[in-house]
Amino acid sequence: MRSRSNSGVRLDSYARLVQQHTILCHQNPVTGLLPASYDQKDAWVRDNVYSILAVWGLGLAYRKNADRDEDKAKAYELEQSVVKLMRGLLHCMIRQVDKVESFKYSQSTKDSLHAKYNTKTCATVVGDDQWGHLQLDATSVYLLFLAQMTASGLHIIHSLDEVNFIQNLVFYIEAAYKTADFGIWERGDKTNQGISELNACSVGMAKAALEALDELDLFGVKGGPQSVIHVLADEVQHCQSILNTLLPRASTSKEVDASLLSVISFPAFAVEDSKLVEITKQEIITKLQGRYGCCRFLRDGYKTPKEDPNRLYYEPAELKLFENIECEWPLFWTYFILDGIFSGNTEQVQEYREALDAVLIKGKNGVPLLPELYSVPPDRVDEEYQNPHTVDRVPMGKLPHMWGQSLYILGNLMAEGFLAPGEIDPLNRRFSTVPKPDVVVQVSILAETEEIKAILKDKGIDVETIAEVYPIRVQPARILSHIYSSLGCNSRMKLSGRPYRLMGVLGTSKLYDIRKTIYTFTPQFIDQQQFYLALDNQMIVEMLRTDLSYLCSRWRMTGQPTITFPISHTMLDEDGASLNSSILAALRKMQDGYFGGARIQTGKLSEFLTTSCCTHLSFMDPGPEGKLYSEDYDEDYDDELDSGNWMDSYDSTRNARCGDEVARYLDHLLAHTGPHPKLTPTSRKGGLDRFRAAVQTTCDLMSLVAKAKELHIQNVHMYLPTKLFQPSRPSLNLLDSPESPQDSQVPSVRVEVHLPRDQSGEVDFQSLVSQLKETSSLQEQADILYMLYTMKGPDWNTELYEEGGSTVRELLSELYVKVGEIRHWGLIRYISGILRKKVEALDEACTDLLSYQKHLTVGLPPEPREKTISAPLPYEALTKLIDEASEGDMNISTLTQEIMVYLAMYMRTQPGLFAEMFRLRIGLIIQVMATELAHSLRCSAEEATEGLMNLSPSAMRNLLHHILSGKEFGVERSVRPTDSNVSPAISIHEIGAVGATKTERTGIMQLKSEIKQVEFRRLSVSPESQTSGGHPSSIDLMSPTFLSPAACISASSGSFPTVCEPQTSKDSRQGQWQRRRRLDGALNRVPIGFYQKVWKILQKCHGLSVEGFVLPSSSTREMTPGEIKFSVHVESVLNRVPQPEYRQLLVEAILVLTMLADIEIHSIGSIIAVEKIVHIANDLFLQEKKTLGADDIMLAKDPASGICTLLYDSAPSGRFGTMTYLSKAAATYVQEFLPHSLCAVQ
């Protein structure tokens, strides 16, 4: 027998420590699970995974350093102990498969997997609502180490059913970036009142698990295509974005948490920004580290002497008692040791190993045991309060703490050289901060038709058509969403697969290998089934620019991203003979190699096959679930052929004769997700009959195209296997009447519809239908259809045409197509609101904004009209809430949804625009947009309203960006026509300070919707009513297009002037500061560090009062200065002020008060009325101005707030600046509490 080497002896000592004293001695021999401790027999998922890591590491070390055969046996035994535990946890979770299925759709805490199980039986131990079960980090850390252990050679997953379950666990955690849970400490909000919140630890761990599992074969080297896990890259990047936004904060209620060490370093390595990693680490060291370890988070009451063991939850004001006496956990020093090993920082490793050795407790036979935590002795609490980190603490809790003990042993194995970082991290997650190579985005431009190809060639752009890229197949993005919805399906386990969600740009920028056929998918934004945004060519260019920029910064996959950008007939000018100028300019820039800050390589799809990222969708291959399309697919074939609704089933019948199963499946999906024309042109029936016969006899694509052309079938592309573009709906005769001059440009006057009456005085609907048929005005058609919609219902048959298809809904849909073709944006928005067209990305846009810790409000203040959205809502609930806040006004509702989508776009690409903004008030933003147009164009509120509603989506988005960015901008009428000749020619451009546009005070306080009054007036129009004239001042407010913010504001408050006064001041900057305050107030923008300063001032008074609403000083007893929760609390008080510029002046007054927080006095008063300070400052301002000769006209006051308009328009600094007067006012107000030397403020 060979003698043992020193390393062998050392390994044996660690084996005894693990097997006989600390971990494996507690493992259940049947389930493989580990109890939390001697007195807590339940098995926590997270604790079990971390506790087995030492066993896994020891097994790897034995396998690597085996001296003799017994060592190899020992390695196998240890590794199988790991497999047994991981499979035990798998059995626990797989017994709750119904919860996994439900949670994918609900994200509800009631549908979550349990956090702990019975060690002996794998059964649940407490009820769904009796514990904070939703802990996404626990599920994620299990999946992360499942991936790492599988990559290291362990075989944990044994069947395809288990593979499908793991795939569904991926769906379970992929929405972590928008799911509030209870976090790693199971408590949620730190008040421990069962309030879930978005936790950085959960988001980071989920991101790591998703990346680790992507394309991983769970059967290891013995696997095949069916055992591979698939992850959508866009979900990973959502987690990455939210994580970067959260850090170094841990959640809304925790400004820092030591658990973030597991996110920025081992095991997750989830952060790619090395600077952010260092910032977060230093925050933990600075705020949480003590003599015995680190606190979990500030004001953590767990096992402190002041915690009441008889109560589960804390009182909010009670949290102040835990400050400076939080328990310290040696566990976190083990993370610092591992971090030092992975980062190569030997000094850090040595420092924390020595520190940890000092707090270890020697057990029986000198075994080193790591206690759970160290607490302040009850009799020395006051001493610790006075001098933090000076009192000697005592160990408490579990001994050993298996989670910490395991990481301690793992750290020692690595520090002593038994394990290399690559062995414990075979998936190389430790290289996350290594700079990535530059990304070159490959763009393949495709033409819808040969005609478009010829037009592009005339411009020097050589492209292919859809047909020419065959056998590569092109599909819209929604088809990829449907394909992924079959991933993970398992009928035996009742798992439905991935929920249908819109596909992100990362997903559509890959090529896909599906049964030996290459597919490419077009970006989501060009899908015209969506909202009307895709009708605007400039908006398409902007969305393309955004996607290209996003790809450059977020692409992490092997190979280059490839975007397939189709040019359709909708991207042509109205004559159909030339390309839209915006599209053409974008194509030329991409050909030059740069667009939107991204490096571009244009070319043919076939040229990109070798350089693109290509994913094999192995789950589309035949598997145990059988065919991927319904079994009755072929059985329905004959029925569909014989049915009268043949066109609706056309796609299925064609594919039923094709031999390609994948094409049949994809086209079957398309047939059920694309719109179908309600009417078939009778003039084409013969041709379609012959075309149908041709389809039945051939599957060859080119033959199909040739026969279609011979039969003069229009829109050939709608019959191709690659159903990229949707057919245009046939135009009804209603829309074929020649356009009147009013429709060729934006009418300045809206048409009053005359309601015909019968002899009994009731509305004569047949006469109204006749009027509908005869009128040539699109606006009047929309008005008549709206009245029919509200009075008779959407399904009322107008009997306009004998062949049918003349219900109100169908006629509105036809009108929507027509106004979409001519880009009449006011009517597009109006009809979209009537039809309740779904903004498919609305709920995702709302969720994205909330995920960045931004609360949303819709409607205008005050509450209850202004509705707050603080948690993700389903689409139906969200639209209902918006409708309620809009008080039934369709235009406001539609505009609110549109603005929400734009805000989400900017949040994803330019989050810096929203710095120091914790609540986005969409109603006020719309109000400011209308106000800016009214004053910049010097027009009436009605004209500004019409201009706002008729802005193209790209112009609306541009205006929003200028308002968010804080840059000075101008709005003016353009002399050159727009591309559509319909939308108003308004240009928005950035200008310098000297050329800033003048804005005058609006005094807008509220939005009072008049939808009911307007409807009543419209329905009771007398026959004698005359049509208005053509002067802009005689605009008919009864037109539905005027049910927009500015018009309603004007009607309710009368604060809008009919026509803006011309500028009389020589100073072109007059109104600049008032405008700036109005914008900042509407956006809730505050100075950097404002909330921390408010927290300090609350320490020295009883509270701050704003318009009767008090921000109490007790808030500081619950919340710390850096909490988002505190910032939102302050916002909720300030938002009681409906007028934006007045609100901003109150912010400035509070900022002056915060300067007093640095003065060494105990108190500066009881409750400070902030508005009184502002009014004192206003009086001082008026008094001084009068002494300088200002008259009453110049010093006019705002009737709503009583503040002089000149004060609103004063710069903050300078002799006559607002800060000067506010400082004097604050000193006057609180002088009785200040030292005499500070009372004389100059």
Curated annotation (Swiss-Prot):
A lipid is attached at C1239 (S-farnesyl cysteine). Pathway: Glycan biosynthesis; glycogen metabolism. Keywords: Calmodulin-binding, Carbohydrate metabolism, Cell membrane, Glycogen metabolism, Lipoprotein, Membrane, Muscle protein, Phosphoprotein, Prenylation. GO terms for cellular component: phosphorylase kinase complex; plasma membrane. Although the final Cys may be farnesylated, the terminal tripeptide is probably not removed, and the C-terminus is not methylated. Pfam families: Glyco_hydro_15, KPBB_C. GO terms for molecular function: calmodulin binding; choline-phosphate cytidylyltransferase activity. InterPro entries: 6-hairpin_glycosidase_sf (IPR008928), 6hp_glycosidase-like_sf (IPR012341), GH15-like (IPR011613), KPBA/B_C (IPR045583), PHK_A/B_su (IPR008734). Gene3D superfamilies: 1.50.10.10. By phosphorylation of various serine residues and by calcium. The modification Phosphoserine is found at S630, S731, S737, S740, S760, S813, S974, S983, S987, S1009, S1020, S1022, S1025, S1132. It is a lipid-anchor. The keyword Amino-acid biosynthesis does not apply. SUPFAM superfamilies: Six-hairpin glycosidases. GO terms for biological process: glycogen metabolic process; phosphatidylcholine biosynthetic process; positive regulation of glycogen catabolic process. The keyword Cell division does not apply. It is found in: Cell membrane. It comes from the Eukaryota. Signal peptide: none annotated. Residues 812-842, 1065-1105 are annotated as: Calmodulin-binding. Hexadecamer of 4 heterotetramers, each composed of alpha, beta, gamma, and delta subunits. Alpha (PHKA1 or PHKA2) and beta (PHKB) are regulatory subunits, gamma (PHKG1 or PHKG2) is the catalytic subunit, and delta is calmodulin. Phosphorylase b kinase catalyzes the phosphorylation of serine in certain substrates, including troponin I. The alpha chain may bind calmodulin. Belongs to the phosphorylase b kinase regulatory chain family. This is Phosphorylase b kinase regulatory subunit alpha, skeletal muscle isoform. It comes from Rattus norvegicus. The lineage of its organism: Eukaryota, Metazoa, Chordata, Craniata, Vertebrata. The gene is Phka1.
